[in-house]
Every structure is written in structure tokens, then in C-alpha cells.
Amino acid sequence: MALQRSNLEEFLTQTWAQRGLAACMLLPVSAVFGGLSALRRAAYRLGLSKSERLPVPVVVVGNIFVGGTGKTPLTIWLVHVLRQAGYTPGVISRGYGVHNDVPQAVTPQSLAQEVGDEPLLIAYRAECPVMVGRDRVAVATALLAAHPEVDVLLSDDGLQHYRMARDVEIVLFDGRGAGNGWLLPAGPLREPVSRRRDFTVLNGAADAPGLPPDAIRMQLVGMTAEKLNDRSQTSALSSFAASDGKHAPTILAAAGIGNPGRFFGLLRSAGLQFEEMALPDHYDFADNPFAHVKADVILITEKDAVKCRQNEGLRNDTRLWVVPVTAQLDGALAEKIVEKLRGRSIA
């Protein structure tokens, strides 16, 4: 396929998976990066830099491994479980590609290029107040002013935004674990694996290198596909596979997410055979990458769907089907988070 991940992305993926020569050559730069990060954390810990506490509890969902690990599905799951616990949650986010200093509300009708694809997906799926902007504290303050009913805030990413005080930190990893365990740029980590947090969540793997044994397992489950131009029209993923002597349709699976292999693996687990198109993360779909694709069915992620709907040519392409995924986690995590928010501890 013409539109594929860059050679640099592939190189970094391979480099960060092992402690090879290329990674070793970058260790001096990683030492500088790590030292500066440690000084910044120490400044907040010692009170030299001030963290601002908001009038409602704050839960931060983030990762220290660069790239996608599944934060958005986890954030949507948290919105639902907190709502079930009696809270009225709101979500704040940086918003990929957002350059506006003024906090901006996100609705399902917002443009992805103005608010970011992940916040747009959260607004669409979670049906709660969502705002984006570069300054998390300003965004949170604006959201609370616009929605005084909100009594807990979820920060989609923002783990390193220390100026915003938080009550709960959830750090998410996937099957890549900690990679080679080194900090950027020699490795994939923004901070050491040993950094303090309240909960560690592992997405889509029974175990991963370099992670604590008490990590809470998360699975992304997707069993159906929905027509992009009519999401009331659904079909089981298994219906796209060959069966009873019938030939399966030719399928293209496309993903512009941080870890497209996870999406492709989900489709394979449903028994599908397909050609892969791994697009760059946050691919904007301003141009139609499927215009010259000869396939009967094109399966895409929800994150890509919010952008495809805003391109008329893609919106009218009847071959496009969206595969929604839902996070499944141990219910004990929800209980522990709620207890922590209420100021009580669990033995």
C-alpha cells in the first residue's frame, strides 16, 4: 500500500524493543532527558513548583510508553463505571494537533482537526462533557464552569502535566511492556517504569516484560462491525469470514492508531483474512487512502471513523465498516478507584 507507516516509525519500533547498538548510541541523550525529567518531578515534589488542586477529584489516565496503549477505551470505560457509582464525570484532554490556547468544548459534531480524534471519539461514545486545550488546569476550570454538575474529572493523558494535582493515577501498558526499559530516545519510555502511580493496567496481554506482577488486565473486545454511513446497520465480524463453502469477501483492514497490530490481531481472532494498511497514527483522512483499493469490505477503527465521517467521499463509501471495541477490566479496579475518590482505603 502506498500509505504506510514511515521508515522512521518502523526503525524506532525495532530499536526500542531491544538493547541493540542503535539504542546504546542514544543512551547519553537519554541520560540528559532522564535527568531533566527527574529535576522537574523533584521541583513539584519539594514545592518549588506549584501544583494546582481543582475543586473536584481528578483521575489521570496515561502512559509512559510513547504511542498508543489503549487510553481512550479505558477512559470511556471509566466514564461508565463512575457514572454507575453515582458520579457525573467530565473529560479533559490535550487533543492531538490542537494549537488553540483557549479551552474548547468537544461535541460529536466537532471537527477532528480542531479538537483531536481521541477527544471526539470520547464525546461520541461516552456522552459526557469533554474539553480540550494545551493547559490542563485552564481546560478543567473551563469545563467545571460550563458544567457545574460535574463532580469528577478524567484526564485522557496528562500524566506528565504535574501542574495539575491529581487524586488517582492510572498508567497503561500493552503487550510491548516497557520495551527495552530505557528512556527516550534510546527507549520508548517518557519516565522510568518505577515511577509512582496508583494502578498499573496491562492491555491485551497476560504478561509483559518489565511490569509489576500486580498489573490489572484489560481486554479490548470487538465482536461486530457497523456500517460507516449507517451505524444502525450491524454485522457480526464472523460474517465476513468464509463459511459453508462460500467465498469470503476481499477485506482490507486499515488502522491509523498507535499500535495497529492490536487491531489486526482482534480481526484475526474473529477468523478473518485480510490485507493490512497500517496508516500513521492520527492520520487525518483529508485524502482518501482507499480510492484505488480493490476490496469488497474495508474495516476501520472507531478512532479513524470519526475522521472518515467528515470526508464526503469516505462517508459515502459503502465498503467501510467500523469495528467498535469495548474495554473489559476486573470490576475490583472500579471499586478501588471509587473508594480512593471517596477518601477511604481498601485493605
Curated annotation (Swiss-Prot):
GO molecular function: ATP binding; tetraacyldisaccharide 4'-kinase activity
Keyword Chloroplast: no
Family matches, as Pfam families: LpxK
Binding residues annotated for ATP, in chain numbering: 65-72
EC numbers for this chain: 2.7.1.130
SUPFAM superfamilies according to UniProt: P-loop containing nucleoside triphosphate hydrolases (SSF52540)
Main enzyme class: transferase
UniProt keyword terms in alphabetical order: ATP-binding, Kinase, Lipid A biosynthesis, Lipid biosynthesis, Lipid metabolism, Nucleotide-binding, Transferase
Record-level GO BP terms: lipid A biosynthetic process; lipopolysaccharide core region biosynthetic process
InterPro entries xrefs: LpxK, P-loop_NTPase
Reactions listed under catalytic activity: a lipid A disaccharide + ATP = a lipid IVA + ADP + H(+)
Pathway the protein contributes to: Glycolipid biosynthesis; lipid IV(A) biosynthesis; lipid IV(A) from (3R)-3-hydroxytetradecanoyl-[acyl-carrier-protein] and UDP-N-acetyl-alpha-D-glucosamine: step 6/6
GO cellular component: plasma membrane
Protein origin, superkingdom: Bacteria
Protein function: Transfers the gamma-phosphate of ATP to the 4'-position of a tetraacyldisaccharide 1-phosphate intermediate (termed DS-1-P) to form tetraacyldisaccharide 1,4'-bis-phosphate (lipid IVA).
Family in the record: Belongs to the LpxK family.
Protein name: Tetraacyldisaccharide 4'-kinase
Species the sequence originates in: Janthinobacterium sp. (strain Marseille)
